[in-house]
Amino acid sequence: YVWADEFMTEEVVTNYLSNAIHYAGGKKEISIRCREQEKNVRISVFNTGDPIPEEDIDKIWFKFYKVDKARTREYGGSGIGLSIVKAIMDSFHQRCGVINHEDGVEFWFELEKGKQS
């Protein structure tokens, strides 16, 4: 189990899922995974589609930054979702990130595992 604010954690997952729904391409597949690590649990949301250009990877966490402005106009995204994720994870003192895959993109965050009593 993990200790984390349930509403803030839900906000992170919701933002990742919203992005996955809007940016899924190719087979339009989305998967959510939860993997236990030594000290953390990593939750990830993967969607098929185009990878994020390497030059944009660090910028996507900034408020109002949009990689594909034309596509964002189609669904009305504001460009603040990932900055909210970053702020929440920073407040938790935990990590979040993104990994490009050949067939899509995986956004992830980690939560510290609770201690057994």
Residue spans of the language-model regions?
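Conserved micro-motifs of the catalytic ATP-binding
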Residues: Y1-A4
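Short alpha-helical Gxxx[C/S/T] motif in the catalytic ATP-binding
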Residues: G76, G81, V85
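Short beta-strand/loop element within the Bergerat-fold HATPase_c
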Residues: K27-K39
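Conserved glycine-rich
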Residues: H93-R95
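A residue-level detector for a conserved hydrophobic packing site
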Residues: T9-E10
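Short helix-loop "hinge" at the ATP-lid/N-box region of the Bergerat-fold HATPase_c
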Residues: A20-I21
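Short conserved segment of the HATPase_c
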Residues: I52-K66
